[in-house]
């Protein structure tokens, strides 16, 4: 999955063409992730995946400060590239402000422990066919993923990480 350029339409198109379409969902809150999974299912009967991050060390949310960064705050140049790519390829752009947190937003702050846990709950509840951990160890969620028949992949950068994921 290519976070920022990924969409249900792109993932479904790749799967329908015989590849494995993957939703790059690192910055998707749980509501948006559930919506994307369901939209993808409406467009394909083929297997598809979801790719998120599971960092080992991450902060807990400070619920008194609900002003965590949004995807648009993180890397503006990357977002500009993704928007240009999506326009060129005829893909639907996110609604302006759709990635901004509202004052009454009860979703976990972006890139907190609660955020990643909520994403994994959605992935398990929605019985996603393939899950890819772009960072970190999906071990704590393997029971739920296996119970669903979800195929699990983990991207690792070192032998020691592969050993951690294997166990």
Provide a role label for each language-model segment.
Residues 1-167:
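Active-site entrance/lid segments in N-terminal catalytic domains of soluble metabolic enzymes
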